[in-house]
Amino acid sequence: MTSRTATEEPLPAASPRYQQLQARLGVGWNTWDVHSVTTQVLLPDGLAIHVGLKHNSTLYGDAFLGDALIGRLTPGAEQVFPGPHAWEGGYTDLRLSWKGHDLRLQTAHDGANVVMLATPLPSQPLSALPATIVFSVNYLWGRPGSVVKEARRIEARSPLHTVAVYCTCKKAPERALAEDVNLPVSDAYFSTDFVQPVGVSSGAPLSIERIEAIIERARQNYAQSVARSGKSAEVVDAIQTVLGWDTIYEPEGRRVLSPVSRVWSVSWGGYVIFDWDTFFAATMASIGDRDLAYADAIETLRSETQQGFVPNYARSGGWKSSDRSEPPVGAITVLGIYQRFHDRWFLEEAFTPLLRWNRWWAAHRDIQGYLTWGSDGTNAPANLDDTARGTRAGAILESGLDNSPMYDDAAYDAATHKLEFADVGLMSMYIADCDALATMADILGEPAAAKEIRERSARYRVKLETLWNSDAGIFLNKDLRTGQFSLRLSPTNFYPLLAKAATPQQAEVMIKNHLLNPKEFWGEWIIPSIARNDPAFKDQNYWRGRIWGPMNYLVYLGLRNYDQPEVSRQFAEKSYDLFLQEWKKNGHVHENYNGLTGTGDDVQSSDRFYHWGALLGYIQYLNETEPLPSPTAVR
């Protein structure tokens, strides 16, 4: 048995400036607890108010719901329909359905305090008895504090604050003893039959009418703030909402960040940072919360391995994929955020780890001057439960495209730990990464680094040009064993547009003959992760034909580099139409979508609240708010 401490990797020390940022983020009431969207937590104390629901019966079948997550798919699980979630948690709203009970839970800030309002909704109860709603209070994460229930309040005392919690709960005398004895709650709590609205307040006892008024004021403030975005209001609401619900406090690192969905994070022990997923969360957060955008980008970089690369994943316990990385989108993310806010310290914080990562690709993933994916199982420390490390499967996972048909025939060289497969997408993303990083070096006054990076970019740009196939009219991946081009097309074949590596003439051919070709990529729902005429498209299984926000986003950024305003506009609008379909219907932000029907609910392998699905809306936000750049930089 391997000891825990033998292989866990601690986080690097944070700079004073970044510590200050985290201190600003990690304060006040919000849905900080990864385990439940119905829990309100006060930071930095760690004081939590949990909402529980007990299903009662006169026969058998009693059950208790102590936590709730968006998108849980196990049989009989609660169904959560997320509503607005302000960046700082000043207003939240959700609906929950479980065992025939339906409720609405709203919260709002009242100065430094919080109010919570639970309202029963019309439903089809499964028993003769009403549900019992429970509000319990404790301290999370081993934080010091004591909680005492008194006659009319629960008082919580920590070294930082003393907080009194009150409830409008009213219990019938004949029900009180049974409720107190039989609820499966070990902490101090309030409980009542859930037959009318119930309110909870911290700081002072408030009437239900006063709580409702505070909630309504917060709701109006949220609506007004979103409305100020004009025609982009709907997408701003969606991005703010998905990132609001997906942002948590991570107690191991004492940090606020936006890992992927809570369902994923819980199953990975409390949190999981995937490289490009969390970089893209940072990009989207930049439309409304600068500190959160910085935190998501910096925390992704702080997860780097001993070898100097950002791993495929970094999870609870300090475990990482030391064998493999993921797509190099860090520099374009950081530079894009910098260009919104122009905070030099942010570039200074990010530049050194980005440069290490950029150098690592060239040193460890180069075959014959081409970049390819890989997985080196000899890297330490080894994650022993990760059976993909040092295998062909691990090398494909480095692409982020776990089961893409592009790699069905790609060979893995166990001696070099690499796929023998020149990858158009990787080379294009890497060149774009180099160009963004060189610009950062210019801003920071690092001429030697800028020269080094541009030389590397130029070298790989020359090699990428050799992957242009004039017969196919597109850049093609290449089997480095046989020298044969692969005719299996995915959105990554358009990534040379992102790197400005295609000539205007090549871009025109690629767009006309392939992107706008309904037999390949165009259609009502765009764009599939493999061409529609590929045999694997019919699988509609993960990266085998489904539509993914990050692919659309990178292709759209590429289109913006060329004089294709109408195609860019249509691409953005079609992406947004796809996103809105289930956002409006169910409040879902899907991990991926069916390439034929545009739905995400048709399979279990599409998380219902995965923030990068909102990139489909972010594309439209860019289309509406940022003018297309001049294409003159493209040769």
Report the location of each language-model feature.
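Terminal accessory carbohydrate-recognition/targeting modules of carbohydrate-active enzymes
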Residues: 1-232, 269, 561, 599, ...
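C-terminal capping/lid segments that line or modulate ligand- or cofactor-binding pockets
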Residues: 8-48, 321, 326-341, 469-514, ...
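The feature captures the catalytic groove of carbohydrate-active enzymes
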Residues: 181-203, 307, 311-329, 335-345, ...
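Substrate-binding groove/exosite segments of carbohydrate-active enzymes
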Residues: 229-335, 339-340, 347, 355, ...
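Long, well-ordered core segments of solenoidal/helical folds
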Residues: 243-251, 289-309, 350-369, 456-474, ...
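Short coil/turn segments at secondary-structure boundaries
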Residues: 254-259, 524-531, 587-591, 632-634
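Alpha-helix N-cap and coil->helix boundary residues
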Residues: 345, 349, 448, 452, ...
